[in-house]
C-alpha cells in the first residue's frame, strides 16, 4: 500500500516528532531532541511517500520525505544552493504476545546547514509496550529510547560529530496514575 502526502506536516523523525507536545508523556522535550531539531521539531512543507510492505508476520513501513528546510532547527538551514531536507524512515512493529509489542525504527536525514554544507543525522528508536488485555485501563508499562548521531560538515576540512539519547519508562499503577522517569544525554550538533 502506497500513500502520498503533500503539504505541511511533522516529519517522521523517530517517535516523538510526529506527536504534538501536549500528547507526550513528559512535561518538557528531551534535550537530545531539542538540540538536533529545536523546540518545534521538523515541521515543513514538502512531500512524503510511505509504503506499507506486504509482510504477514509483522508491520513494516518505509517512508521517504523531502521538505523545505524552513524549520528553526539547530541542525538544518535553508541554504542558497540546497533548499531541501531528505529523510528516510523504516518502522518495524512486532506483536510479541496479546499483551506486549515492540517497535524498532531507523531514520536517516540529510540537509543543508548554515555553512552551505550538509548535516547528516542517523537515529534509532526502540519502544516496548506491555498492556494486559484483562486490565488494560488500569495497568501498563512502556519503555522508549531514542539515539541520535550527527555529522555536520562545515568545510572540506571541518566536520563536527555529536551524539545524544534519551530513555524513559512509564508505569501505569492505576486508571489515571502513572510513574514516569527519563534520562537524557545530549551534545550540540554544531561547533560552538
Residues of each region from the PLM?
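Residue-level detector of functional hotspots within protein domains
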Residues: 33-35, 48, 76, 92, ...
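Outer-membrane beta-barrel and related beta-rich outer-membrane complex signature
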Residues: 16-21, 74-76, 116, 157
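Detector for outer-membrane/organellar transmembrane beta-barrel domains
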Residues: 99-191
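Outer membrane beta-barrel
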Residues: 1-72, 82-84, 91-99, 168-188
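Conformationally flexible catalytic loops at phosphate/diphosphate-handling active centers
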Residues: 79
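Surface-exposed flexible segments
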Residues: 84-86, 160
Amino acid at each position: 500500500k502506497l500513500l502520498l502526502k503533500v503539504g505541511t506536516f511533522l516529519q517522521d523523525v523517530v517517535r516523538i516528532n510526529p506527536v504534538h507536545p501536549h500528547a507526550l508523556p513528559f512535561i518538557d522535550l528531551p534535550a537530545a531532541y531539542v538540540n538536533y531539531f529545536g523546540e518545534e521539531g521538523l515541521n515543513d512543507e514538502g512531500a512524503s511517500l510511505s509504503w506499507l510492505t506486504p509482510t504477514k508476520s509483522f508491520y513494516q513501513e518505509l517512508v521517504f520525505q523531502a521538505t523545505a528546510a524552513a524549520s528553526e532547527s539547530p541542525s538544518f538551514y535553508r541554504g542558497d544552493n540546497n533548499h531541501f531536507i531528505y529523510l528516510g524512515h523504516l518502522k518495524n512493529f512486532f506483536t510479541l504476545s496479546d499483551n506486549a509489542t515492540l517497535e524498532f525504527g531507523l531514520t536517516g536525514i540529510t540537509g543543508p546547514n548554515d555553512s552551505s554544507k550538509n548535516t547528516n543525522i542517523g537515529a534509532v528508536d526502540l519502544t516496548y509496550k506491555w498492556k494486559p488485555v484483562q486490565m488494560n485501563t488500569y495497568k501498563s508499562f512502556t519503555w522508549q529510547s531514542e539515539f541520535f548521531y550527527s555529522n555536520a560538515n562545515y568545510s572540506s576540512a571541518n566536520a563536527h560529530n555529536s551524539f545524544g539519547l534519551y530513555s524513559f519508562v512509564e508505569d501505569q499503577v492505576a486508571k489515571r496514575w502513572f510513574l514516569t522517569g527519563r534520562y537524557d544525554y545530549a551534545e550540540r550538533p554544531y561547533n560552538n
